[in-house]
Structures are given as C-alpha cells and as structure tokens.
Amino acid sequence: MRKLILQMQMSVDGFVGSDEDRRWQLWEWGDDSAWDEELKQDFNAVFTTLGTILLSRKMVEEGYLTHWGNAAKKYPKDRFYAFAQRIVEAEKVVASDKLAASRWERTRVVSGDLPREVDALKQGDGGDIAVFGGAGFASALIAAGLVDEFQLFINPAVLGSGRRIFDKSGFARLTLLGSKPYACGMVVSRYAPAQ
C-alpha cells in the first residue's frame, strides 16, 4: 500500500501560516532560496519516490501547478528544480467539491468522501502520495487519520499566532522516523502515527 506523506512548512512554535502578511519561510517558493545544498538534495530525493501528488483546490487555484510547471521550463537543467519536473510528470489529484473537471495536464478532480478517495489512491499502483495544501486541508486529512507520514520543515522563525494543522484533531502519539538539521537553520522532522 502506498503511503500518504504530508509535507508542511512550519514555524518553531508550530504554525503553518501567519495571520499577517510577512515572510517567515526560508524559501517562499520564488527564485531566491535560503535553503542549503544538502536540504535541496534531500527535498528532491523525496520527489523521486512519489507517484501521485494530492492537492487541495485552493492550492491549485492559487497557482501551484502553473508555478511549478513554469519553473520546470525555466530551469530545465538546474538540479535543484528537478522536483518541479517531477511535479509536471506525476499524476495529480485535486480534492474539491467545487471543481467539476481539471484544466491541468495529468490532473484529475475527486470529490465527495475524502477518506474513501484517499484510501482508493493508497490502494493504487506506483510510488507514494505527497500532499500539499493549506492548514484546513491538512487538518481534515489528519482528523480523518489518513496521514501515514508527516514531513515537517521547521523554519527558524517564531510567529506567535497563525494557522495550525493539529488543532482540530491530532494523534495522541507520533513515532519519530528521523530528524535532520541543516546549515541554513531548517530542521526536517519526519513522524508517523504511533501504532
């Protein structure tokens, strides 16, 4: 069975989004990144294991697919942007009750019962499934017990307030799969729900 992997940028105090419009992530997904080379390599390594990318409707409408499609074209030989090419090539699934059909290449829309749709994806063939979306989408997946692995990219920032992913429901206990600090100040911690 394929794993559902939730990747989230997070502040040291556990927020995944700021209430104010301020830059706090080491990389805000633009052309300039404060990530060090080792972090970039490790980030790309995750994408080599993926078969499917699950996205929230909002993430797609805010330009996720267009942005990374453009990055793949703009930086075709840049090793750091190899993940962008993988996003273009991978199957994408958008969870939405509002979109009727996909207008993006290699992308389909699923609606209705989210746990049923995710279970069907997990039963499918291919590599693991990465999830990208906002706090609400991530919280819904967590509350439904659908996440098999958390990859938390903990930025060296304290927000004090904002959006969290574990407020609605969380796991009473997580098992640490690994944690790695990087020279740029990022710590990537990987957890699985305790059995």
Language-model segments: residues:
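Enzymes that bind and transform nitrogen-containing heteroaromatic metabolites
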Residues: 1-195
